[in-house]
Amino acid sequence: MKEFGLIVVDKPIGPTSHQVVAIVRKGTGVRKVGHAGTLDPRASGVLVLCLGPATRLSEYLSGTTKEYEAIVRFGISTRTFDTDGEITRRSGRAPARREIEDVLPEFRGDVEQRPPPYSAVKVQGRKAYELARAGDDPTLQPRTVHISRLELRSYQPPDLALRVECSAGTYIRSLAHDLGERLQTGAHLAGLRRTRAGPFPLDQATAWPMLEVGMLTGKWERYVLPAAAALPELPAVVVDDKGLEALRFGHAIPAEPASSGIAKAIDSTGELLAVLEAVEDGSLWHPRKVFFG
């Protein structure tokens, strides 16, 4: 059974990311399953699942650039910044297309963004949504995020379709809310689809019904990608049997030629063995994470 690798799934609207993880854990029999970047229940699209030792790769995947297609609905603001929340403002007005085009540049590049009150951001040790549900009004500090692309795809008032490419930690719900505030109409996020997570575009994702059938029939392993696919930008160091034994016991291996930064160690078949870090002036590769026993 393949207990080391990735499944890139097209998450449907409805389940939480944690529910998807639980279903896959039960359906595959793999005891350790995690995800590399939460998608809200009402969002669909690319969700990267990590199996077995590959859960230790989530730190490299969760911080990658994400791409989304979003629907912003003007005229109504909500407490959750999406369609689920209590309405807090109803202006009944949608801005003109030219007004939107004029303000979009303000939301590109480095942007100060305050997370939604209903989010998993910690406030004094508790998640913001827990405080909000208890009737508190959590004070969330703004954070700097980077929006590298923000394109107007179409506009049929009151609904604006956007394409967004952004850094990890960007809340598209906050982007929708902030657009409404800037245009003085109010707005909320009416739809969201993640079209890329790091190196994985939507067209590489397995449709959820296909994965469900695969789990029912015992053929889910066909959808497992090699763990090395999570690290396409890292240089590869092919390790021989001697190096394999050294890494197994946490020992460094020679770097030939001298190197810097981090790399991935693979065997002759391309299987990921470890994440390496250059030490001793680049003459050695020290194993930062080892994925075999």
Model-derived regions: residue spans:
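Catalytic cores of RNA-modifying enzymes
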Residues: 1-168, 172-205
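Accessory RNA 3′-end/elbow-binding domains used by RNA modification enzymes
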Residues: 1-12, 18-35, 39, 43, ...
